[in-house]
Amino acid sequence: MTNIRKTHPLIKIINHSFIDLPAPSNISAWWNFGSLLGICLIIQILTGLFLAMHYTSDTMTAFSSVTHICRDVNYGWLIRYMHANGASMFFICLFLHVGRGLYYGSYTYFETWNIGVILLFAVMATAFMGYVLPWGQMSFWGATVITNLLSAIPYIGTTLVEWIWGGFSVDKATLTRFFAFHFILPFIITALVMVHLLFLHETGSNNPSGLISDSDKIPFHPYYTIKDILGILLLILVLMILVLFSPDLLGDPDNYTPANPLNTPPHIKPEWYFLFAYAILRSIPNKLGGVLALVLSILILMLFPILHMSKQRSMMFRPLSQCMFWILVADLFTLTWIGGQPVEYPFIIIGQLASILYFMIILLIMPAISLFENKLLKW
């Protein structure tokens, strides 16, 4: 009898994707983040579904409904904090996953890479809209500030913002539509993930050396299933430590105050995972310029396949590029720190320098270093 795993039309697809998939024999723990992101997405969809059963998307009752979830629903506090901190874990895994792609030259699979960048945008949009839902002070003012950025678009800006708001300010209509979008987007993300995997399995995985590994492949199961399970257990451990010991560590205290359009918080700032982009936005004194820099700070990832000048794919054997990569990482940490600081003397100039350095490293310095390393290869 033929194995059902290899003949059944549906199970066959799963088999080719997760069981009999030929994988390089030398992929390190940096390749675990894809599966971790999948687990994060599942956690977010499940916890989000249970939250949606008790949440009301109305300005009068949204804040109270979140309080009700935390106080009266069985393990509601656990579901709520798993969802909030699950988003942080999602972004940590995302940043590490993208960083791995940059370091090892995975962006040369450009369909997979571009779908990945679109996924990053979709997850960021979902997270932003989710942050608005509890209808605390930071939810309301964050929504006001970020949606207002669209008014910088010439000619149609103001009309566009009012159309998104569903009125002349962030109000009931805005909250309702944000809830609708926040609910539907994760399912769109799931579909995009399948496309992402489809393109990845056309080429097969990259590996740390950046060399073609066709001559040395091993089956995904049991080798990488076991490895992924270890990663998943560690992810859940870190998430549960965060949820059970310090659930509000990454949140903003202002969001425990119900939204009040008449009272602006002293420092409006987004969640930690948006701070680097927020710092780039604030570093340009012009509104339209800031918005363009904000969008380009993420969109620039799509340029990496074009900007790749090296004869080698991975940075494994390129110490100068490695050095520049870690300077870029340090620069992103600096931007994240600046994004959370008030707009005053030392922070403004540090933010501007870090923003200039960010774009310079990617657009000029790294391609130049790659060309120099090519020269070094000619003995």
UniProtKB/Swiss-Prot annotation:
Keyword entries, A-Z: Electron transport, Heme, Iron, Membrane, Metal-binding, Mitochondrion, Mitochondrion inner membrane, Respiratory chain, Transmembrane, Transmembrane helix, Transport, Ubiquinone
SUPFAM superfamilies for the chain: a domain/subunit of cytochrome bc1 complex (Ubiquinol-cytochrome c reductase), Transmembrane di-heme cytochromes
InterPro entries: Cyt_b/b6_C (IPR005798), Cyt_b/b6_C_sf (IPR036150), Cyt_b/b6_N (IPR005797), Cytb/b6-like_sf (IPR027387), Cytochrome_b (IPR030689), Cytochrome_b_C_euk/bac (IPR048260), Cytochrome_b_N_euk/bac (IPR048259), Di-haem_cyt_TM (IPR016174)
Keyword Transport annotated: yes
Binding site for heme b b562: H83, H182
Topology of this chain in the membrane: Multi-pass membrane protein
GO molecular function, one term: ubiquinol-cytochrome-c reductase activity
Compartments in which it is found: Mitochondrion inner membrane
UniProt keyword annotation of Transcription regulation present: no
Gene Ontology BP annotations: mitochondrial electron transport, ubiquinol to cytochrome c
Record-listed heme b b566 binding positions: H97, H196
Membrane-spanning residues: 33-53, 77-98, 113-133, 178-198, 226-246, 288-308, 320-340, 347-367
GO cellular component: mitochondrial inner membrane; respiratory chain complex III
Cofactors (names): heme b
Note accompanying the cofactor annotation: Binds 2 heme b groups non-covalently.
Record-linked CDD domains: cytochrome_b_C, Cytochrome_b_N
Residues engaged in binding a ubiquinone: H201
Pfam families: Cytochrom_B_C, Cytochrome_B
Subunit structure, as described in the record: The cytochrome bc1 complex contains 11 subunits: 3 respiratory subunits (MT-CYB, CYC1 and UQCRFS1), 2 core proteins (UQCRC1 and UQCRC2) and 6 low-molecular weight proteins (UQCRH/QCR6, UQCRB/QCR7, UQCRQ/QCR8, UQCR10/QCR9, UQCR11/QCR10 and a cleavage product of UQCRFS1). This cytochrome bc1 complex then forms a dimer.
Stated role: Component of the ubiquinol-cytochrome c reductase complex (complex III or cytochrome b-c1 complex) that is part of the mitochondrial respiratory chain. The b-c1 complex mediates electron transfer from ubiquinol to cytochrome c. Contributes to the generation of a proton gradient across the mitochondrial membrane that is then used for ATP synthesis.
Other facts: Heme 1 (or BL or b562) is low-potential and absorbs at about 562 nm, and heme 2 (or BH or b566) is high-potential and absorbs at about 566 nm.
Entry similarity comment: Belongs to the cytochrome b family.
Name under which the protein is recorded: Cytochrome b
